[in-house]
């Protein structure tokens, strides 16, 4: 049997853990996703970051172009059909009511825009901070996005 130890004295010293240093070395995403995850600037070379940003930007730009063309065609075609129907006498548009509704919508938008200014400012600040921290990836994304729009 193992020998019992007597309780130690009150003068026993304890090791103090510095949690700030621990937090710097062990990011929260390391616990979630593993040791190999982390910010792009810590993981990949500059060339890899540019390529990753460029490829994802090109994909986003290409999809934006295709969806934009489809949406523009749908909206333009709808207006064209409305004009043809109006010209043919199938429908009649009450332009005074349209003007009244447009003015009402303008007033509502102005009223709502004044309320949401602080939220927009914080969104802009967060976006600016993100772009500054990830300037290489952001630059690659913008370049790829423009190339995707052009292709």
From Swiss-Prot:
GO terms for biological process: autophagy of mitochondrion; response to hypoxia. The keyword Mitochondrion applies. Its main location: mitochondrion. GO terms for cellular component: mitochondrial outer membrane. A motif (YXXL) lies at residues 14-17. It is a multi-pass membrane protein. It comes from the Eukaryota. PANTHER family: FUN14 DOMAIN CONTAINING, FUN14 DOMAIN-CONTAINING PROTEIN 1. Acts as an activator of hypoxia-induced mitophagy, an important mechanism for mitochondrial quality control. Belongs to the FUN14 family. This is FUN14 domain-containing protein 1. It comes from Xenopus tropicalis (Western clawed frog). The lineage of its organism: Eukaryota, Metazoa, Chordata, Craniata, Vertebrata. The gene is fundc1.
